[in-house]
Design a protein with these regions (language model features):
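Short, conserved charged micro-motifs
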Residues: 82-90, 136
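Long, highly charged amphipathic alpha-helices
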Residues: 14, 18, 90-97
């Protein structure tokens, strides 16, 4: 009998579920996604998106089992209209708290970046953490 190598499950669905439940309270239903499309935010006054940048193996054992990975995510926050600058940072703050609650640390940002539509303010933050298959408060 051949033992199958154990791998750490990709956390993208868990992270998106927790992040989206928090961010929806700030930006509204349907104003967030996992899409990297640059046009989704153009017709909205508040919008946020998250996407995985990678999930490389961090540790493995001699049998080939994957013991931990380092998932990395980017979160883009968008706001348009009056007080867009303060609003975009408020969206980023809600997102940041959701990511930190899952054990992620901000590795970049929050940085205000130029957007193709100058009426839309955009803030980018990136996060990573060591992941062993469980987020905080999950049972093994």
């Amino acid at each position: 009998m051949i033992d199958m190598a154990v791998t750490v499950d990709n956390p993208v669905s868990k992270v998106y579920s927790i992040w989206s439940s928090e961010i929806e309270k700030k930006v509204g239903k349907g104003n967030y996604s996992m899409s990297q499309s640059g046009t989704l935010a153009s017709n909205k006054t508040k919008y946020a998106r998250i996407f995985m940048m990678g999930n490389p193996t961090r540790d493995g054992d001699l049998e080939g089992n994957e013991c931990s990975t380092i998932p990395a995510f980017q979160v883009d926050s968008f706001a348009k209209g009056t007080k867009a600058l303060s609003e975009v940072y408020a969206i980023d703050d809600v997102s940041h708290k959701a990511m930190v609650s899952m054990g992620f640390r901000r590795s970049y940002g929050p940085e205000l970046l130029e957007n193709s539509d100058s009426t839309i303010k955009r803030v980018v933050s990136r996060y990573s953490r060591v992941y062993t298959g469980y987020l905080p408060d999950e049972t093994k």
